[in-house]
Each structure stands twice: as structure tokens, then as C-alpha cells.
Amino acid sequence: MALLTAAARLLGAKNSSCLVLAARHASASSTNLKDILSNLIPKEQARVKTFRQQHGKTVVGQITVDMMYGGMRGMKGLVYETSVLDPDEGIRFRGYSIPECQKLLPKAKGGEEPLPEGLFWLLVTGQMPTEEQVSWLSQEWAKRAALPSHVVTMLDNFPTNLHPMSQLSAAITALNSESNFARAYAEGINRTKYWELIYEDCMDLIAKLPCVAAKIYRNLYREGSSIGAIDSKLDWSHNFTNMLCYTEPQFTELMRLYLTIHSDHDGGNVSAHTSHLVGSALSDTYLSFAAAMNGLAGPLHGLANQEVLVWLTQLQKEVGKDVSDEKLRDYIWNTLNSGRVVPGYGHAVLRKTDPRYSCQREFALKHLPKDPMFKLVAQLYKIVPNILLEQGKAKNPWPNVDAHSGVLLQYYGMTEMNYYTVLFGVSRALGVLAQLIWSRALGFPLERPKSMSTDGLMKFVDSKSG
């Protein structure tokens, strides 16, 4: 307890609630995640019930006409437990910043990057896991990883011109045949047990996703070669990179980092909100997550890192690989003056450099400092924000996660840009499925906001102003 109290002081008041929760259950040394959840959930249910009884009618915020027409930006309308996006600090996973997660989460033997299993444990429980708990999760996912034969057959028979994200979504939907929740619901299970079945489905799906994703990659880009077998002695990311046919240890380390930092980003983004919305209809884990992946496949959500690489490649083609700052400034101004944006810069919520960009930059500085594409990205980081500030249009002139991730993947030989969003999808499962468990545990109802027509909204405004 003393150690946790000291940690609370070190990490600050914003993390204290997370640490108090951890302290309350510090004696729970079980390596079985479901057992720990069984202890946590009743207490959290009681806490939320009391909170709603006391403050259920409290006004949280106002809704403006611009919010309704502007994609509900800034509208507070969701409860999402696993992560919070602060405009000035960036993402916090259960109260922990990315640098804190990099420092505190368990790592593979000899590795330096956090294991995604540890982040999932943190997202689900609010507690920093032990190495033993993370090892248990790695082994548990290895046990659950096998794909049913009909999904394998389906993947093997997709046409090669079908987009990797379409294949991913279809395969996840087909895995719905394995849903524990769907079967139990059809048999009339009590709603207090919903979370237990959703938990099983989430664990199964996360375990199987690397196999699905690797099979898509091998079929499209490696002549349909076998993904091989899961090794129960390896962690989730290591098995994934092996199945992708990448054996470079640094690439495995990159994948651990990538899968960790792309896992969750508040509840209002398209993939997280879609999963939450579809899940509120009591659609099972597979249907909810497949819907989320269809949202992620949209160019405004999950395709941004491809757009960055296309732009960087075009830049190099037009001005050369070793470009001066002056020529680079001219190119950026030409891009802006032609009505286009600089891909990878700005964010709908953030008002600072994305910490997910920063940790990828640190990885590149350590492992590929002389790579020409990275040097260009670093040069842009030095120049673009000042130009965007000078232009005066951007609310956030700083780079986001997409400004960097594609460059790292390219360096290690993964040049198939159409596939990058699949990696994003595998990672995003950790966050949205952790939340899905809690949505059912807390009994969140069917999401059903009220819509208005333009005429109705105009009449409403007239009645207020008249």
C-alpha cells in the first residue's frame, strides 16, 4: 500500500483514482483475468449506481447547432472507461500517459517496448499487471488462437482484389459462429451474466485476430504461404510477426510498440463509438467489432498513414531525397496554397504533438536515425508546425500518430500500404473490446439519441429566440 501511495504522488492527482482502485485490490495476485474482474465489477456497479442516484440529473454540458451539424465534435455524450483524450496532454490509458505505460508495463525478456497484453490488462482492470499476469494472458491467447475451418476456407477463397480491410471485416463476422454470448443469449441467460460471455468472446477474438490478419497478408503478398503454428512460449506480438514472416527482433519490438499505442483513443472516434453503438444492441463481440472495422476502413479514420506515405513519396520524387529546408518550405506552401493539407499534421481533439508520434520518433532515433525517409519526417517536424502557425488556419499545427507509423513499417520491409489499417485494427481490438466488457458489466442500455430535421431545428431555434 505504501508503494502505491508513493506512486500516486509520483504520477499526480489525475492518476490517483486509478491507483486507489489498484490499491483496493492489491492483494488480488491472481493471474486469471476473469477472476479479478469478478471481484472488481460488483464494486464498480455499486459505485456507479450510487453516483447516478446522487447526480443523475446534473447537467454535464450544452449542445449547440454547430455541434449537431459538425459531427458532434466536443459533445459530451458517452461514458467510456478505458481511456481519456486530453487536448493538451494526449491519451491516458486508465490514467497513465504513454511514457508512463512504456516505463511501467511489463516487457518481453530482453525487450524495451511494452507488451500489448499488459496494456489490455490495464485497460480492463485499471491496474498495472505483474509479469506473471501478462505471461498468463500471452499463454491464454495462444490457447484460443486457432481459427475454425470455415473461416480459413473463406480467407483462402477471397479474390486478391478484395481490400485487406474488407477481408478482415468479413472474417471477423464469420467468427460469429463461435460466439459464446450469442448462444447463451438465445438460451435465455440472465443479464447479470452478460459480461462473462462477452469476456470469453473478447478473449477469443483478440487471440484469433493475429491469425486472421497474418493469413490475409500471406494470401495477398506471400503467395498464400502458411502462417505456421502459434508458439505458446512467445508473446502475442512475437507470434504475430512470426506469422507475418518477419523475424527481425527490432520489427517485433516495433510491433509491440505499435499495437500498444494504437489500441485506444477515447470513446468518440469512429471505431470505438461504432463498437459501443452496435454492442448496445446486444450484438455479440464479433458483430460489434466487425462494424468497428468497417468504420476504421474509412479514409477519414484509418487510412491516414497511407496518405502520409503517398505524400512523402511524391515529395521525394518532385524535390529529391536530400532537400534543403528552403525547398521544403516552398513545397509545403505550394501544398497549402493549392487547397490541400499536409498529411499527418493536426488532430480533431489534440492541441499538442501527439505522444504516439513522439514515442515512434524516439524509436526511430534509436534504431534508424540515418534512414532517408525518417530524416525527411524529422525535417518536416522542424518546419511544418511553424508554417501552419504562420498560415493561421490550423487549430493544431503539430504532428499526429499517422505522420510516423508508415515510415517505420516501410523501413523494416512492410511496404504494402493497403495492409497498414489491418495492423491498426488488430491493435484497436485491445481498447474497444476492453470497453465492451465493461459496457455489459455496467448494463449500458441501447444507445438511442434524438435526431432533428433542419426544419425542426430552425423552428426550435426560432421558438427560443422569439
UniProtKB/Swiss-Prot annotation:
Gene3D superfamilies xrefs: Citrate Synthase, domain 1, Cytochrome P450-Terp, domain 2
One BP term from GO: heart development
Sites of N6-acetyllysine modification: 76, 321, 327, 375, 382, 393, 459
GO MF annotations, alphabetized: acyltransferase activity, acyl groups converted into alkyl on transfer; citrate (Si)-synthase activity; citrate synthase activity; identical protein binding
Amino acids binding oxaloacetate: 356, 428, 448
Active site: 301, 347, 402
Catalytic activity: oxaloacetate + acetyl-CoA + H2O = citrate + CoA + H(+)
Keyword annotations of the record: Acetylation, Methylation, Mitochondrion, Phosphoprotein, Transferase, Transit peptide, Tricarboxylic acid cycle, Ubl conjugation
EC number: 2.3.3.1
Subcellular location: Mitochondrion matrix
Phosphoserine: modified positions: 226
FT transit peptide: 1-27
GO cellular component: mitochondrial matrix; mitochondrion
Keyword Metal-binding tagged: no
SUPFAM superfamilies xref list: Citrate synthase (SSF48256)
Domain of life the protein comes from: Eukaryota
Pfam families: Citrate_synt (PF00285)
Post-translational modification: Methylated. Trimethylation at Lys-395 by CSKMT decreases citrate synthase activity.
Assembly with partners or alone: Homodimer.
UniProt family annotation: Belongs to the citrate synthase family.
The protein's role, per its UniProt record: Key enzyme of the Krebs tricarboxylic acid cycle which catalyzes the synthesis of citrate from acetyl coenzyme A and oxaloacetate.
Protein name, as recorded: Citrate synthase, mitochondrial
